Design a protein with these regions (language model features):
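DEDD superfamily 3′-5′ metal-dependent exonuclease/proofreading module
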Residues: 1-476
């Protein structure tokens, strides 16, 4: 189901209910940029700390434009799963001293167009959000009673005209003595907040509140003697404003509050962006970044890493084509896994998708990640018990616990990022040190051409006459 700013408020109660009922949540995201070029090339030399240090400044300029969440609910009576999928369309906002910015790479635009990304939903209908750091700034302004004046200073001309128009109309209405109430229909929650404040400031005797049944309406009573007159407490107006500007961050807060296991595929960049976009600026130290993420999201599974490790148990004839998400999903959904011939759960998706056109759509990919997790968990649980039979979600989670909080690392010195402990030691062969015996400056290009047929290797200069070679496997 597509969620935009137009239906977010009416759907948030259903989303909350479905999240609470879920046993785990699939997650996927689409970004405004990808880390490409020689400066961000994945190298076999890289430790996770080095890779984090390399990308953190660039990632801070990127945002998630779509977040897919699929809530998997276990129906014990039928031993089935109901999967409720959502695609949240996000858009940054400018508010007071906060002006969220980002980069869009041409290559990413091309990729998104190829996969039918809806830019109108992103720009016109995207849900706002705030990081926890930004939320703290706004709440401090509220506490200091400086938010309203700050918002007025940053108002666009059209909103400024609307504010003056409303205040002038209130003045004329009070002078004329006509009617006991007046109301304005104001779509923008920020402008609505400003109008409440300004009318109360300029006309101390009037009372203002949100009109019952229509939160877009500012209802004004001539004075406290009007029958039924009431004035919304400032705390209520502030809460209404915060709920609107927090937007999608309310969903992030629900994930944090309920501590549901989060399932994704190849999550390294997703996790870094989760911090940058919804927690706050990426910390200087890699260890602090891992601690922050784990404090808020204590249970994360990466099906890319799980499938890489469990795939080692399959023969060549049994193995999937690759463990890219599409290949892995089709391997399981088409019944190709010989380890899962009995007792597998039926998974019922509530949201229709055109499968062949939906990959790289965040909602669909979040479903695929959760689907693969269920199948991998069933396989692992049955392997542990020695028999293939029905397996519930708790048993699946327990069977895959070894892989919990281990985030796949592409082409690095170590296979995964450990969010709860030290990263593992390098699993690559010992580095090969070579030295030029004749030339005063070692020729890296020449070395590359000589060994390129040997397999997966990386080379880096190590002084004028020496270089280091990293191999992907001991068979290289």
């Amino acid at each position: 189901m597509d969620i935009t700013k137009n239906n977010f408020a009416e759907q948030i109660d259903n989303i909350t209910k479905n999240l609470k009922r879920s046993c785990f949540v699939g997650l996927d995201a689409e970004f405004t940029a990808i880390l490409s070029g020689d400066g961000f090339k994945h190298r076999l030399f890289d430790t996770n700390k080095e890779r984090y240090d390399l990308i953190k400044n660039e990632v801070s300029k990127m945002i998630m434009t779509q977040v897919g969440l699929t809530m998997f609910q276990y129906e014990r009576e039928f031993d089935n799963y109901a999967a409720i999928g959502y695609t949240f369309h996000l858009c940054p906002q400018a508010l007071a001293d906060i002006d969220q910015s980002f980069i869009f790479q041409a290559s990413t635009l091309k990729f998104l167009c190829k996969h039918n990304f809806d830019f109108n939903k992103f720009i016109y209908d995207g849900i706002p959000y705030l990081s926890r750091h930004e939320e703290k700034i706004i709440r401090q302004m509220i506490h200091d009673k400086t938010l309203n004046s700050n918002l007025i200073q940053k108002m666009e001309i059209e909103d400024e005209k609307k504010l003056q128009q409303c205040c002038s109309e209130v003045s004329r209405w009070l002078t004329s003595g006509e009617g006991e109430t007046l109301y304005f229909d104001i779509e923008s929650p920020v402008l609505r907040y400003i109008i409440h404040n300004e009318i109360r400031l300029r006309f101390p005797d009037v009372l203002t509140t949100d009109s019952l049944g229509n939160s877009n309406k500012v209802l004004i009573y001539r004075d406290k003697y009007v029958e039924g007159a009431n004035s919304a407490p400032m705390a209520v107006l502030e809460d209404n404003l915060m709920n609107n500007i927090l937007g999608f961050s309310q969903i992030i807060n629900l994930l944090v509050e309920h501590k549901k296991p989060i399932i994704g595929h190849n999550l390294f960049l997703d996790v870094v962006l989760l911090h940058s976009q919804f927690i706050g600026p990426l910390p200087k130290y890699y260890s602090a970044f891992k601690k922050n993420v784990n404090n808020l999201f204590p249970i994360i599974f990466d099906t890319k890493y799980i499938s890489h490790e469990m795939g080692k148990k399959l023969s060549y004839d049994e193995l999937w084509n690759s463990n890219k998400l599409q290949d892995l999903y089709e391997f399981f959904s088409e019944g190709k896994c010989k380890k899962l011939e009995k007792g597998i759960n039926f998974i019922k998706l509530s949201t229709p998708f055109n499968v062949k056109q939906s990959y790289h759509e965040a909602g669909w990919d979040s479903y695929c990640s959760g689907y693969c997790f269920i199948r991998l968990g069933h396989w692992a649980a049955c392997e542990t018990s020695g028999s293939y039979r029905p397996v519930g979600p708790k048993e699946k989670l327990a069977a895959l616990d070894f892989y919990c909080n281990k985030i796949n690392v592409i082409r690095g010195a170590v296979p995964y990022m450990n969010l709860v402990s030290d990263d593992p030691p390098s699993h690559r062969p010992t580095l090969l040190h070579i030295k030029s015996m004749k030339e005063r400056m070692i020729n890296i290009a020449k070395i590359s051409s000589v060994i390129e047929s040997s397999g997966s290797v990386d080379i880096k200069r190590y002084g004028n006459r020496t270089a280091l070679i990293a191999a992907g496997t001991r068979n290289t």
